[in-house]
Structure formats: C-alpha cells, structure tokens
Amino acid sequence: MNVVDKLVDLIRKTSSSLPEDVLKALKAAARKERKGSSAAVVLKTILENCAIAAKRGTPLCQDTGTLTFFVDERLRRKVTPAVIKKAVALATEKGYLRKNTIDSVTGKSYDDNVCEGAPVVHYVGSDNVALGSVVSGSSRSKDALRPKVTLILKGGGSENMSRQYSLPDAALGAGRDLAGVRACILDAVQKIQGYGCAPGILGVCIGGDRATGYEAAKEQLLRPLDEKPSALEKRLLREANSLGIGPMGLGGKTTLLGVKIAARPRVPASFFVTIAYMCWACRRRTVCVE
C-alpha cells in the first residue's frame, strides 16, 4: 500500500470507527444510567450508530469535521502536504468525508476539502503527545519508535463550544490559581450544556498564550481516555458529571467522558485557561508509515 492509499485508509477508519478507549467509555457510561431514562436511550442510540458505521465503513457523524494531521517530522519528505491533500481529495471523492470546507469570505465550497489551510498539517517530534496513541491492533512498545501519522476529526458543534478564559475573571470570582482554573472549567461545562453533543471530552491548557493554549488544549484530546488521570483531572471529571447535565443535555450521570489537562509557561501579564471541547464522536487514529 503506497502512502496516499495508507492515508486514505486512515481517513476512512477515523471517520467510521471510534477508538477502543472511547467506545469503552461510552459503554461504561451506558451501564451507569437508569434503564429507560433519556440518558440511557441516548447512549444506546450512539452505540448502535457506532456499530452500524463501523460495519459499513461510512461516517459515524454527518459532520466529518476539520481534518488535523500530526506527522512525525522524520516523515517530512514522504508525507508532504501535497501527498496529504491528494489523500483527502480522494477520500472525499469516495464518500469517506462530506464536502465540508467553505471559503470564509466568498462562501465558496471547496468540494474536495482541499485549499490553502485545509487540511491542517503539523510536523511534530516523535515524543509529541499526538503520536503517542496506540496504533490499532498493535502494542504501544512495538510501535514506539516507528514514525507515525495521527489524524483527528473535529466537528463544528464541538468546536463552537471551545472557549478561552483570561484570569483573573471578576464575573466568576476566579483568581490566578488552581481554584480559578477549576472555576473556569466548570463554568465552561455549565455553559456548554448539551449543545456540543454530550457526553464530551475536555482538553485543557493552563497558561501559554492565546495561540499555544488552543494548540495544547486540542492535543490533549489525543490522549487515551483510559490513561491514568491526574488528581486534578479526576476531580474535575467527577465535579462536571455531578452537574447532572447528561447525554445531549437531557439529564444523567455522564456529562463528560474525560478531562485531559496540560500546562504551558506564560508571561507575567497573562494567565489563560483554554478549553477544547470534543463531542462523544472523538474520532482520532494513528497509523505507522515506513
């Protein structure tokens, strides 16, 4: 299989099949909800949808999202932006992606999902969190040193719910400390309600500037949900789920499937808390490329 074909296959699988850790979290959430409740029905429907999409190889959500590729820098000459764009255009032609890219000024549709700035491509070091996820069907240790490409698809509904706070925040009574960070995160969850297709996942960055904050927060969405959480992540997940917002905002025990937090250095004058929200359709996948 050549590189273009391998990337097309990556796009197809990412669009049609959830990672095992996300499926596991959804199934665990379904078991917690009261039988016959709105939350239980929503989660059952989500899981049925996932099974059908995986079996047919068709997109599991109509919004196939913004495509963001993280490419091991060792592959810079092999997996070029031109190669990636060719794969995206071919995947769109095959129906693995919908026509989902619009010129923000003219309103023109880029029917192959390819133009300047789309798809998004980042070349990163092999130790980047984006390349640390387990490759399907392989062990982490086996693939640790092999160059990889990771793809994440993020739909507009979840992207619209992402937000950034600047501390101190007088309206929240939030200062420049972890208590203030906690206030921002819980405020974001409360405001999101079910609009971002809950249950969701939060990627959080404490610090950084406005640009690196969003970048780091989004990268946290690539971390496995079954990875051992920090004490802060565990606490915030528990507190967010205690709000009772539930799947699709209809009430229930599971508002979030996970919280993943990173910290970045900041200048004295700024203290940002950035939250990248991902819906239940956390479509991410990694493939080795030799």
Predicted regions and their residues:
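Non-transmembrane, aqueous-exposed alpha-helical and coiled segments at domain scale
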Residues: 1-137, 143-204, 209-290
